[in-house]
A protein has these predicted regions:
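Short, surface-exposed loop or secondary-structure junction motifs
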Residues: 60, 65-71, 124-342
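Active-site SXXK
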Residues: 59, 84-112, 191-199, 266, ...
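Short, well-ordered beta-strand elements
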Residues: 62-64, 337-354, 465-469
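Short, conserved catalytic-motif segment at the N-terminal edge
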Residues: 35-83, 105-107, 121-126, 154-159, ...
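Peripheral terminal and inter-domain segments
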Residues: 362-607
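Boundary at the C-terminal end of the N-terminal hydrophobic targeting segment
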Residues: 30-32
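Bacterial N-terminal signal peptides
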Residues: 17-27
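N-terminal secretory signal peptides that target proteins for export/translocation
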Residues: 1-12
């Protein structure tokens, strides 16, 4: 009897256990199916070709795919499909540099100016603040991000020497825009310089050094060498705005964005990043350096109390209720993102083979964060609990610096922010995004709506006031001066419209009453049709080169101020300066001079 009871109990236990396991399995399958369906819906909503992704949860890897690797051939994405991930490759390159530091070849505080002495450095702070390897890794060197001719240049070859990216006639290409180490400002040039440092130290091509490191990381399907869809059939086709194919093209700043990989290799890389710097019992990166991958250090914003920013490889981000360390990447026809949550040993990566400006790629981050069930961060303060007197920091703030120096005027006019005080903090207004509120949570510390922790900090460097979110820094500026700029721009644009209309009318009426000087600037504006046509006939990859289109644009745009000036002088000679046409010409001349002073005219993209 006793054994019968034991047998019945065992059978019952077995049935219940089996039922429980089947329930768990069905739940997991259901969750996986829901995630797959949600991602497929996002692909359809944003007209994206395909995606590969992987999640890592405390040792458990889960990789998947959806959509097309090549629409024309009807080839679908697979786990072994290769993708190009742009700036996500910077994280891998950073590990390569940290490996050189770990092995004693170089040091974080080594001067880059000493390691690359043949380049024309123009660092005005070199005596007290030389640019170091740490500055390049953390994007705090002060160097500009990228020039148009470095980005769009069809003459670039896969083996073009890296130094050619810095041998342009521009004498200020290696001039920091702020004291190195004091601010964050994303720089593709900086990571290309890291590639040059690797070559100088190892005496081999950086691609070969990095590929040997990839073997140590067990990333055998990845490479820093140039790969095309023609040379490797496993590489997915890139797409622009839906179904417009874009083959892989070589880059001048290739250490900053040339990296081909697979979702399985990136899963392996996530596992390494969440570890202590070891791979197959070999020390790749010191544990102390691994702890700094996403931790900012030394900037004014960090020293003023803001913990968010960029570390040696990743940026600390506060999104969707979770705090992670991430790095996105874009390249021709691809978008990718890598995120880690070290405290929970979790992470994810995804790559999409479509670059669509209207797509909200952050929706994929939200989906994968939810799939990983990342623990939601909790506030370490109560909103509105800061009782110290709040200083009014209202006013206009301009990007300092902006992302690309050659577009500084555009960012000044269209990408500044304005703060107005509220009961609990400040409203932030911008032409580029919807208004949002930042709530006071500490002395000059603020939290943005939808964030968990402090997102902004206000500080003073002894000369200027700034507000920063760790990745974008704004300097306080004069609102009245910006409004004056807008007045000149609007008045000048109105004058251009009238000038074109008057020029057309005068041209139709003929020259019975003599030649009207307004026809001179009008004719120059008509000549803009030449570069417009030539640009429509060339590849966008030639945009940064000296072509017939770019040269004609430079000549015509340079000629417009002179045409306005000559026309004004002719009106003066004819004693017609008080005429309507003369007034319009003078206002157009004012606009031309204004744009010239602000380095907008002449329009040159190859400098």
């Amino acid at each position: 009897m006793f054994f019968c009871e034991i047998s019945r109990c065992f059978r019952s236990f077995y049935r219940y256990t089996l039922a429980f396991l089947l329930f768990c399995l069905s739940s997991l399958t259901s969750n996986a199916n829901e995630q797959q369906a949600e991602i497929q819906q996002l692909l359809a909503d944003y007209d994206l070709a395909g995606i590969v992704w992987t999640t890592f949860d405390d040792g458990q890897k889960n990789s998947s795919f959806s959509g097309f690797a090549n629409i024309k051939s009807n080839r679908r994405m697979q786990l072994d499909t290769k993708v190009q991930v742009g700036s996500v490759g910077k994280v891998v390159l950073a590990v390569g540099v940290l490996h050189l530091i770990t092995t004693g070849k170089i040091h974080l505080n080594d001067s880059v100016e000493d390691l690359l002495p043949t380049l024309d450095w123009q660092n005005h702070w070199s005596n007290n603040a030389p640019i170091t390897i740490e500055h390049l890794l953390a994007h705090t060197s002060g160097l500009d991000n990228i020039k148009m001719w470095q980005l769009l240049n069809s003459s670039t070859k896969p083996d073009t020497p890296l130094a050619e990216a810095f041998l342009n006639t521009d004498p200020h290409i290696l001039t920091p825009r702020f004291e190195p180490g004091t601010q964050y400002s994303y720089s593709n040039m900086g990571y290309s310089l890291l590639g040059m440092i690797i070559q100088a130290v190892t005496r081999k091509d950086y691609e070969d050094y990095m590929d040997s490191l990839l073997e140590k990381l067990n990333m055998n399907d990845s490479t820093f060498n140039f790969v095309t869809q023609g040379s490797d059939s496993r590489l997915a086709m890139g797409y622009f705005e839906g179904t417009n194919p874009q083959i892989a093209v070589p880059m001048l700043l290739r250490p900053a964005g040339q990296f081909t990989t697979t979702v399985n290799d990136m899963s392996q890389f996530i596992q390494f990043l969440l570890g202590n710097g070891m791979s197959d019992n070999e020390r790749i990166v010191q544990a102390a350096l691994m702890n700094r991958l996403g931790v900012p250090k030394g900037t004014f914003a960090f020293e003023s109390g803001l913990e968010h920013g960029h570390g040696l490889a990743l940026a600390k981000r506060d999104r969707h209720g979770a705090i992670g360390y991430c790095h996105p990447g874009e390249t021709f026809g691809f978008y990718a993102n890598l995120c880690l949550f070290p405290e929970e040993k979790k992470g994810y990566f995804f790559a999409i083979n479509t670059d669509n400006e209207s797509a909200l790629y952050d929706d994929f981050n939200r989906t994968l964060i939810n799939q990983l069930n990342v623990r939601k961060a909790t506030e370490n303060y109560e909103a509105g609990s800061f009782n110290n007197p709040q200083q009014d920091i209202s006013g206009l703030y301009i990007l300092s610096p902006n992302n690309m120096l050659e577009f500084h005027w555009l960012d000044y006019m269209f990408n500044s922010i304005y703060l107005t005080a509220t009961e609990s903090g400040f409203k932030v207004y911008s032409l580029q995004q919807e208004e949002f509120e930042i709530t006071t949570v500490g002395k000059f510390l603020y939290r943005r709506d939808g964030r968990i922790n402090t997102s902004h900090v206000y500080y003073h460097d002894g000369q200027f006031a700034f507000i920063s979110d760790g990745l974008n820094t704004y300097k306080k500026s004069s609102l009245s001066f910006l409004l004056l700029n807008w007045f000149v721009l609007i008045l000048g644009c109105f004058a251009l419209i009238v000038l074109i209309a008057r020029g057309a009318v005068v041209s139709v009426r003929g020259f019975k009453k003599g030649i009207n000087p307004i026809l001179l600037p009008f004719s120059v504006l008509c000549l803009l049709a030449i570069p417009v046509y030539l640009y429509s006939q060339q590849s966008f990859l030639d945009f940064g080169e000296q072509t017939a289109a770019s040269i004609s644009l430079a000549v015509v745009s340079a000629g417009f101020p002179f045409a306005c000036l000559i026309a004004a002088l002719l009106y003066a000679k004819e004693k017609k300066l008080k005429s309507f046409d003369a007034l319009i010409t003078l206002i157009a001349l004012m606009l031309a001079l204004y744009l010239t002073v602000n380095d907008v005219l002449p329009i040159i993209f190859w400098k």
